[in-house]
């Protein structure tokens, strides 16, 4: 008997194993079958299209001349579309692959955990008290919170059910617990494969036991996918089947997200045992906050389970949630009683409603139910009582176009001024001085408003500016103690002193930049509109040096700092701004040379003054102050002094730039001197009126004598000056070469920095877009960038 029973069990297990093998084979071949079906479906669809088109063409030929040709064609097209839809649906059904049970349950548990987290966040949002207990008075939707708790409970039960299904799936083909010893060992005669139920083991197809709770064994090739011998975990490391692995992963995620502490080898009955033991409909007892009263009086209006229960009016007849239903029943009963319809309720509420109807009929003064009765309110009368009838006249309405921040300030000032004037007139009319001051303040405010609401410009006194310039000449960045001391001495605000130093530094830097951009041969010029303190200070210091050099050549009535320049285009006498001449102090050799070359000063007629002024534009830009001179001989003398200063600067620049070509330059100067002498002789005749004045005649005689002296001593001075100039020129050239090398190195360093920044930006796609939109000088050059490599060699 026992042998027959064991044979029957073995036959049943073999049948189950065959069924499972067929399923596994179907899943393995499903992918290949799917691809083959897709290819065949594509071919069949093309063939079907061709057949349908041929049929349509043949039928259209036969029915071309019939009346119902169009209708037949439409009917045929609809039939073809329907057949295509049916075929596509069949193909979709056939192509559907059965999802593995372990993957399906794993997705299900992931969805349930996300849902639990969302509902728990809703509960936590209303559970906290907030900062200083402000959330205590928050309106709490109790129905929504109760629904969230029910959803969490349902999710927990769903997780329990998923683990139960995994245990059932893993129990198929498992070994009995009797066979397993207390230490977990199993005899080899009792081990069989859960898929094929065979006990045989081969070297390349060995039987492997699952270390989970399923108590199953598998051949290596019976698994899906088959397990290779190399991938078998060595030593004490465990191997798990797909169902046990899925169960372990689900329990681990539950413990991590929800905060539970279930062991990995726990049974499905141990998971959420308390929630499963609760009776149906008592989910609210799990909630710790169910006894809290609702802060909202109308919180019971919304019941999220109304749709599920089909309205739920019958369940809310008695209790707090049936307030609205009671009111509706009362209103309907009142309407029915007024129309003469009898109410047959038979309950206690029906008697109460009938009593209320009788009370309404007997006394009209008392309102028992229904909407609140409010008497009509005359809002115009209420407004007059609160603000008075004259409130509209006192208010001055303004249009939207007149509104603005300046207008608001203006109205405020006008109202303040008007109120102060009224109070002063009412109190006493004797204080006329106070009224005048108020009027003056109003005028000032109006003038400020007309100018755009700007503040009055503050100017420092002259003595303070001079003192600050002296300190700035010593140090451009004085310390805080020095600035505070200056502010105390000059009785100024320390902030204004700091601002003055900041502005002067800015102006000095700007002037240095403009001078560095210009050519070295050109004169250092500053526009007449720049009235910075640094520029004025430099010009004042340089005019003192020029005055010392020009004392011997200029007549006694001439002033180098104050001179008048008349434009040749305008005949009208106009006043120009005073301009200070700024030149570098010449050397002793150039001074002697210029004193002997006095013949370079030439009397120029009024018709050629425009040419002289065009040559001297660079000099006139540096001048900042000028006055109108009444006498014409002073005008000519000022022009001559400017010319000498310009020539001094030109000679000095040429001496610095070209020291080796000094002899050729001196010969050119000699020829220029001779030409100027001839011009001076030619120009003496048209200037009879001007030569009558003593100052000009003496100047011409001195120039003629100076020209004769220069011709004789020119050769001697040239030799002496050439030697000295060569020495100075060598020093200057060495310094210039060093400066040029430093400048070149600085430029290369800047280019290297720019290239590295661009390369760093080019690594990211955002940086490429920015480089495409940016405008820089490197974009105009070639796209190839040459990066120099610096190599440092040690001196041997």
UniProtKB/Swiss-Prot annotation:
- Pfam (any one): PHD
Q: Where is this region: 5 X 27 AA tandem repeats?
A: 605-735
Chain segments annotated as transmembrane:
none
Residues in the DNA-binding region are 452-511
| Acidic residues composition-biased segments | 292-303
> What family name appears in the similarity comment?
Belongs to the PHD-associated homeobox family.
Chain intervals annotated as zinc finger (PHD-type)? 190-247
| Biased segments, Low complexity type | 570-580
Database matches in InterPro entries: HD, Homeodomain-like_sf, PRHA-like_PHD-finger, Zinc_finger_PHD-type_CS, Znf_FYVE_PHD, Znf_PHD, Znf_PHD-finger, Znf_RING/FYVE/PHD
Q: Where is this region: Disordered?
A: 34-57, 80-99, 282-347, 393-422, 511-736
**GO MF annotation list:** DNA-binding transcription factor activity; sequence-specific DNA binding; zinc ion binding
Role of this protein: Specifically binds to the fungal elicitor-responsive DNA element, 5'-CTAATTGTTTA-3', of the gene PR2 promoter.
Cite the repeat ranges for sequence.
Answer: 605-631, 632-658, 659-685, 686-712, 713-735
GO BP, one example? response to auxin
Q: Where in the cell is it found?
A: Nucleus
- Biased composition regions of type Basic residues, renumbered to the chain: 81-90
Q: Which UniProt keywords apply?
A: DNA-binding, Homeobox, Metal-binding, Nucleus, Plant defense, Repeat, Transcription, Transcription regulation, Zinc, Zinc-finger
Instruction: Detail the disulphide connectivity of this chain as listed in its UniProt entry.
Output: none
Q: What is the lineage of its organism?
A: Eukaryota, Viridiplantae, Streptophyta, Embryophyta, Tracheophyta
Induction cue? By pathogen infection.
Point to the regions of Basic and acidic residues compositional bias: 624-636, 645-690, 700-733
Residue spans of biased composition, Polar residues class: 538-547, 560-569, 581-600
Q: Which gene encodes it?
A: PRH
Query: By what name is this protein known?
Result: Pathogenesis-related homeodomain protein
One CC-aspect GO term? nucleus
């Amino acid at each position: 008997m026992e042998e027959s029973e064991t044979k029957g069990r073995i036959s049943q297990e073999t049948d189950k194993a065959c069924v499972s093998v067929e399923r596994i084979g179907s899943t393995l071949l499903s992918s290949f079958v799917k691809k083959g079906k897709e290819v065949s479906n594509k071919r069949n669809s093309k063939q079907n299209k061709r057949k349908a088109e041929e049929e349509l063409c043949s039928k259209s030929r036969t029915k071309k001349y019939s009346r119902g040709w169009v209708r037949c064609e439409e009917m045929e097209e609809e039939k073809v579309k329907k057949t295509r839809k049916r075929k596509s649906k069949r193909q979709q059904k056939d192509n559907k692959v059965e999802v593995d049970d372990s993957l399906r349950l794993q997705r299900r548990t992931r969805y349930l955990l996300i849902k639990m987290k969302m509902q728990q966040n809703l509960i936590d949002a209303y559970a906290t008290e907030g900062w200083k207990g402000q959330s205590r008075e928050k309106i709490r939707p109790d129905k929504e919170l109760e629904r969230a708790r029910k959803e969490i409970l349902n999710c927990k039960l769903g997780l329990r059910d998923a683990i139960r299904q995994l245990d059932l799936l893993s129990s198929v083909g498992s070994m009995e617990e009797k066979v397993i010893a207390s230490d977990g060992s199993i005899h080899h005669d009792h081990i069989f494969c859960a898929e094929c139920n065979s006990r045989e083991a081969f070297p390349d197809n060995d039987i492997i036991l699952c270390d989970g709770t399923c108590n199953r064994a598998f051949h290596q090739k019976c698994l899906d996918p088959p397990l290779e011998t190399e991938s078998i975990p060595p030593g004490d490391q465990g191997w798990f089947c797909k169902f046990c692995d899925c169960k372990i992963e689900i329990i681990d995620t539950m413990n991590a997200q929800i905060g539970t502490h279930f062991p990995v080898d726990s049974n499905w009955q141990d998971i959420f045992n308390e929630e499963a033991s609760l009776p149906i409909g008592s989910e609210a007892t799990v909630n710790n906050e169910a006894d809290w009263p609702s802060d909202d009086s109308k919180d019971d209006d919304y019941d999220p389970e109304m749709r599920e229960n089909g309205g739920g009016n019958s369940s809310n007849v008695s209790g707090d949630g049936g307030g609205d239903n009671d009111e509706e029943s009362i209103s309907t009963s009142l309407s029915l009683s007024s129309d003469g319809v009898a109410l047959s309720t038979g309950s206690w509420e029906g008697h109460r409603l009938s009593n209320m109807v009788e009370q309404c009929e007997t006394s009209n003064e008392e309102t028992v139910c229904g909407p609140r009765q409010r008497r009509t309110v005359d809002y115009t009368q209420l407004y007059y009582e609160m603000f008075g009838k004259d409130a509209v006249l006192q208010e001055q309405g303004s249009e939207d176009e007149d509104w603005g921040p300046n207008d608001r300030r203006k109205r405020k000032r006008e109202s303040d001024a008007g109120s102060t004037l009224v109070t002063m007139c009412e109190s006493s009319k004797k204080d006329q001085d106070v009224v005048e001051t108020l009027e003056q303040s109003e005028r000032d405010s109006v003038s400020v408003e007309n100018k755009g609401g700007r503040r009055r410009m503050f100017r420092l006194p002259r003595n303070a500016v001079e003192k600050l310039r002296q300190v700035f000449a010593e140090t451009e960045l004085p310390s805080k103690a020095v600035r505070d001391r200056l502010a105390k001495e000059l009785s100024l605000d320390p902030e204004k002193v700091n601002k003055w130093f900041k502005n002067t530094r800015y102006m000095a830097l700007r002037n240095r930049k403009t001078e560095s951009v210009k050519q070295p041969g050109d004169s250092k010029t500053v526009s007449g509109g720049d009235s910075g303190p640094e520029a004025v200070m430099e010009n004042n210091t340089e005019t003192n040096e020029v005055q010392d050099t020009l004392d011997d050549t200029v007549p006694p009535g001439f002033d180098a700092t104050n001179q008048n320049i008349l434009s040749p285009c305008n005949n009208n006498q106009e006043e120009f701004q005073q301009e200070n001449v700024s030149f570098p102090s010449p050397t002793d050799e150039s001074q002697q040379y210029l004193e002997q070359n006095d013949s370079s000063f030439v009397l120029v007629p009024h018709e050629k003054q425009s040419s002289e002024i065009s040559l001297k534009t660079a000099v006139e830009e540096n001048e900042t102050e000028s006055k109108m001179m009444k006498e014409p001989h002073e005008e000519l003398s000022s022009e001559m002094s400017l010319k000498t200063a310009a020539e001094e600067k030109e000679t000095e620049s040429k001496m610095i730039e070209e020291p080796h070509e000094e002899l050729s330059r001196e010969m050119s100067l000699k020829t220029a001197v001779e030409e100027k002498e001839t011009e001076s002789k030619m120009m003496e005749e048209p200037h009879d009126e001007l030569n009558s004045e003593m100052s000009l005649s003496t100047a011409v005689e001195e120039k003629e004598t100076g020209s004769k002296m220069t011709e004789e001593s020119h050769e001697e001075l040239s030799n002496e000056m050439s030697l000295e100039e060569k020495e100075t020129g060598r020093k200057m050239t060495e310094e210039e070469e060093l400066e040029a090398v430093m400048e070149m190195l600085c430029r290369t360093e800047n280019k290297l920095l720019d290239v590295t920044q661009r390369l760093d930006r080019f690594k990211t796609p955002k940086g490429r877009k920015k480089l495409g939109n940016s405008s820089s000088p490197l974009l105009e050059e070639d796209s190839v960038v040459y990066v120099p490599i610096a190599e440092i060699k040690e001196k041997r």
